C-alpha cells in the first residue's frame, strides 16, 4: 500500500476541525495525530502500518469488534435497494420497522415505542422535548426543570451540553443553561466522609437530590437523567442501593427518570440494558453506540407505555407532533442495526461482556491496585478504570498541569494498546469491544501495568 500518511496528516492539520481536540496544538503540529486505515476484531491499524489493540472500542461503541462482514454486507445491500426515505407522516422502511421491533423485544419491561436519531446528543435533545411536551399536555407547564449529575455525560449540544456535568463541555460555551440543575455524583471513591458505607453514601446522594427538589419546588421538577454507570465522568459504578434510593425520591415527587444508555445499552455491562442490570425503572431510555456498534450513525429514544399514552393524547388535542430529523430511521443505519443485533445474539456478546469483564477487572486489580499511586481500580461489565492519586492515604489529586492520565495513556499506546485518559481527573479508562477474549484482556493488563510503572518511575 502506498504510504500517504504524511500527505494525509498535512491535510488533516490544515483542514480538519476535530471534536474534543486542542485546536491550536493540532493545527501547529504540537500534538499527536493518527490516520486510522483499517480494523479487525479488537485491533485497528493506521496508515503507517502500526497496529493497536483498541481497549476503548472507539468511544465505547464498536461492541461487536471491527471488520464484521455481515454488517458491511447489510449496509451495502440496503444502499443498493433503497438508500434513503424519510420517516415523516407515517412512512417507514422494512429495515426501520424490523429494527424497532427488535429493540422493543430486548428493552426493559414497560417500554413501548422507539424514536430514531443519529447520535446520543440528539436523542437526549429529543428526550427533553418529549418531557416538556408531556407535562404541557398534562396541564403542568411549570414542571420543566431537569436534574442531572456532576460528572454525568449526556451530549455536547446546548441542552445536552447543559445536562453534561463536566467542565470541559461548559467552558466558554455559556453552559449550563436553565432549566438544568446538577446534583451529587455517586462517586464512592470521592465520598465526603470516608467512614460511609456504600448504602450510607447512596442515601446521602438521595437526600441531596430530595433537598434540591424541595428547594426548587417539586411542581417545577420534571425529570432526572443519569447513566446507569458514569462513563466519561470516570467510569464510576453506582454504590449499592443507589438506584433504588434515587427511584424512591423520584416516585415520591412524580418525576420522570431518563436512563442514558448510550454507552451501556446492548450488552456493555453483561446484560442487554444497564437499567435491568441495576434495577432502574426508566420512563425514557437513550440508546446509540451499541445499537449499530458504530458501523453507521444511529440513536434512539425508547418511550415507556406511561409516556406514550400521554403523547398520543397530545396528538389528539394538537395534531401531529412537531419534532423530526431528516435522517431519523435512516434505512442504511437501520440495516446496520439489524445485522449488529443479530451478531450480538449469534456470538454471545452480552454473556462474554459479563464473564470476560469480570476476569479483566480482576486481573487489572491484581496487576496495578497495589501501586503506590493507584487509588482505585473499578468498573462493571466490560468497563474499567484506574484512578491515580498523589497520596494513596488521603486520595490527594495530582496537580492538573502534570497531566498524569494523558501520560499513562500515551505510554500505554507505545505498548500497542489504546486506553482513554478521562477528561476530568487522572483516570485511565477501558471499554473494549465486547468480543474481547481472555488472552486479549491479558495483553491489555500487561501493557497497563508496564505503562503505569514506567510513568511513575519518571515523576
Indicate residue ranges for each PLM-predicted region.
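Conserved N-terminal phosphate-binding loop of PLP-dependent enzymes in the Aspartate aminotransferase
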Residues: 1-459
Amino acid at each position: 500500500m502506498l504510504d500517504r500518511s504524511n500527505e494525509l496528516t498535512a491535510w488533516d492539520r490544515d483542514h480538519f476541525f476535530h471534536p474534543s481536540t486542542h485546536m491550536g496544538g493540532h493545527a501547529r503540529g504540537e500534538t499527536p495525530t493518527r490516520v486510522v486505515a483499517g480494523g479487525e476484531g479488537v485491533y485497528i491499524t493506521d496508515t503507517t502500518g502500526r497496529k493497536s489493540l483498541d481497549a476503548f472500542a472507539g468511544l465505547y461503541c464498536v461492541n461487536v469488534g471491527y471488520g464484521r462482514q455481515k454488517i458491511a454486507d447489510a449496509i451495502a445491500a440496503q444502499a443498493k435497494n433503497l438508500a434513503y426515505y424519510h420517516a415523516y407522516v407515517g412512512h417507514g422502511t422494512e429495515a426501520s420497522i424490523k429494527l424497532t421491533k427488535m429493540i422493543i423485544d430486548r428493552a426493559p419491561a414497560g417500554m413501548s415505542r422507539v424514536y430514531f436519531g443519529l447520535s446520543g446528543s440528539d436523542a437526549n435533545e429529543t428526550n427533553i422535548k418529549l418531557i416538556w411536551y408531556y407535562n404541557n399536555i398534562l396541564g403542568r407547564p411549570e414542571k420543566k426543570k431537569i436534574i442531572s449529575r456532576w460528572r454525568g455525560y449526556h451530549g455536547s449540544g446546548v441542552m445536552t451540553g447543559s445536562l453534561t456535568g463536566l467542565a470541559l463541555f461548559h467552558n466558554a460555551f455559556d453552559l449550563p443553561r436553565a432549566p438544568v440543575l446538577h446534583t451529587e455524583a455517586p462517586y464512592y471513591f470521592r465520598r465526603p466522609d470516608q467512614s460511609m458505607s456504600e448504602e450510607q453514601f447512596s442515601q446521602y446522594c438521595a437526600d441531596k437530590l430530595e433537598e434540591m427538589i424541595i428547594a426548587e419546588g417539586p411542581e417545577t421538577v420534571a425529570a432526572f437523567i443519569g447513566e446507569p454507570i458514569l462513563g466519561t465522568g470516570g467510569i464510576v459504578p453506582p454504590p449499592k442501593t443507589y438506584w433504588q434510593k434515587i427511584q424512591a425520591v423520584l416516585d415520591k415527587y412524580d418525576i420522570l427518570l431518563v436512563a442514558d444508555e448510550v454507552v451501556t445499552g446492548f450488552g456493555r455491562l453483561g446484560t442487554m440494558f444497564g437499567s435491568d442490570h441495576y434495577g432502574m425503572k426508566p420512563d425514557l431510555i437513550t440508546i446509540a453506540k451499541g445499537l449499530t456498534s458504530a458501523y453507521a450513525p444511529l440513536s434512539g429514544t425508547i418511550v415507556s407505555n406511561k409516556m406514550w399514552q400521554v403523547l398520543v393524547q397530545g396528538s389528539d388535542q394538537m395534531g401531529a407532533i412537531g419534532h423530526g430529523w431528516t435522517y431519523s430511521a435512516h434505512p442504511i443505519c437501520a440495516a446496520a442495526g439489524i445485522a449488529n443485533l443479530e451478531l450480538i445474539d449469534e456470538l454471545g456478546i452480552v454473556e462474554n461482556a459479563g464473564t470476560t469483564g469480570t476476569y479483566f477487572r480482576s486481573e487489572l486489580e491484581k496487576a496495578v491496585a497495589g501501586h503506590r499511586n493507584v487509588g482505585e481500580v473499578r468498573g462493571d461489565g466490560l468497563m474499567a478504570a484506574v484512578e491515580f492519586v498523589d497520596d494513596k492515604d488521603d486520595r490527594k489529586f495530582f496537580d492538573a498541569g502534570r497531566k498524569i492520565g494523558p501520560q499513562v495513556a500515551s505510554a500505554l499506546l507505545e505498548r500497542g494498546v489504546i486506553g482513554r485518559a478521562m477528561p476530568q481527573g487522572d483516570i485511565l479508562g477501558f471499554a473494549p469491544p465486547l468480543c474481547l477474549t481472555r488472552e486479549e484482556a491479558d495483553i491489555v493488563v500487561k501493557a497497563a501495568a508496564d505503562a503505569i510503572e514506567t510513568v511513575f518511575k519518571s515523576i
